[in-house]
């Protein structure tokens, strides 16, 4: 055989082999773990019909992060398909038994698909999923809708908004808030307008405002650069304060009215009617509303909220900031002189109690925020003494009745000097251990649920609130597993769940239509008011009921919505966030660990001539002196063994 004939024969054999590989991968003969095919020319030829057993995040996914679907049907091959029918990825689903829903499910992992666009999953023998997007800004609209939900909860004023072509509005409500009968025995009134209606009812509760405001203020402090430019459709949108903070200010304005008029610093527990009202519009509720006597938990939460408001509003409105911190000081002094846990006397009221077993967590949070705002030694010692009494520093499951995590986060992330190194290490260890546990729980759950098999009234709020733990852990010890678990929590409430339904009104696939919300039940409009996370299944994953009367599973609440807002805030304007320097991430994989130290040593010793990217070069300069050398190696090694608390130095 001639040399030319031999070359021609080899070309034909290689071409035949390539054709065979493509054919076999498209038909699912090769497992996706062995061959992951990105086929730009192949088109879907079968007419796939929507099947609700293919369950995924109907809002969409962010490039370069986890993307998973759960398929509750026997299957193997799946395709990721563009809107025009082009197959961009072929994979093999892996089976697992979900101990939560007690079913065998199949996990389709298509995390390597990162091109922005609109797609669906096609599963031979099953059907296709709802369309979803992959985009850096995929959560922008969801975030704005959740914030719209907060605006529409405003009390003491009229509200008006159009969403998806439907107009939602109500007239001025509860303008007589509130009477002092239960405070001083006189039927006189003290102004307590503004604030948000709490949940499905129209009352206002300080303790639940605590976790709500705390979560949203932390969202601002953790993601300020991402949130500051976000424009919201609110009446104050053209003033000099960022819109996100304008919405919070409306709540703080009400919070400031809750101090007793006698100047003692005590804070009323709630403003409420004696009994829950009917399903009528807020402007039609005319029952008298009263200040309910003080509690130590409400007073401590007041201190924390107003202290946070003082430092956050200081750059935008110094006079308002001064008003907030002065109020906080008065109530803090009262608490210092009155250490007993005092429950509110709520006799005569059948509305939400928000009675905490202990106020230790509330007082700890108050001390943390006072110290972070003012820097006084007194507040630091108060916090550290209280924190030492908590055997577990970070709890995986927390809400209005346990706000200690909020104080721990503030202390841990504070850049103020003087912190106790041993306490810092203890909190950090607890944080990372808890975050790692949440990651494992999500990875071992058939629907990526970060709360695992735990269910109770409002548990959906906790699912998204756990993103706070994951995001703070990621700030302390960068790890893409934390980010992906946070995204799993979001995915769960937007459709990757047993029902293949979004749990947020007005968003995603087949969202709730009948929430336990008086406005939605009374306004005569078919669609519910938008932007609200409902409570979710209880007592188990199959017990959610989308009916108005099911307050146990289908109510809305400001604390759950604030948790959703925090979760989404971490991924708003995410493109700009991704461009931030992650000091110590020398291999540019989104983590800082011993692998980075090894690469940095090799680079400094010239065993390798380049780092993976220009961003990696910036990440390697951990002392920010404009050079990458042995000093950076020393600093990074000290950081990894926790001699140095944070990077850069």
From Swiss-Prot:
Protein task: This enzyme catalyzes the endohydrolysis of 1,4-beta-glucosidic linkages in cellulose, lichenin and cereal beta-D-glucans.
In short, the EC number is 3.2.1.4
Q: What is the lineage of its organism?
A: Bacteria, Bacillati, Bacillota, Clostridia, Eubacteriales
Record InterPro entries = 6-hairpin_glycosidase_sf, 6hp_glycosidase-like_sf, Cellulase_Ig-like, Dockerin_1_rpt, Dockerin_dom, Dockerin_dom_sf, EF_Hand_1_Ca_BS, Glyco_hydro_9
Domain Dockerin: start-end pairs = 579-649
What name does the UniProt record give this protein? Endoglucanase D
Q: Which GO terms describe its molecular function?
A: cellulase activity
In terms of SUPFAM superfamilies, this protein maps to:
E set domains (SSF81296), Six-hairpin glycosidases (SSF48208), Type I dockerin domain (SSF63446)
The protein's required cofactor(s) are namely: Ca(2+)
Q: Describe the family membership recorded for this protein in Swiss-Prot or TrEMBL.
A: Belongs to the glycosyl hydrolase 9 (cellulase E) family.
Which source organism? Answer: Acetivibrio thermocellus (strain ATCC 27405 / DSM 1237 / JCM 9322 / NBRC 103400 / NCIMB 10682 / NRRL B-4536 / VPI 7372)
List of catalytic residues: 201 (nucleophile), 516, 546, 555 (proton donor)
For this UniProt record, the keywords arranged alphabetically read as follows: Calcium, Carbohydrate metabolism, Cellulose degradation, Glycosidase, Hydrolase, Polysaccharide degradation, Signal
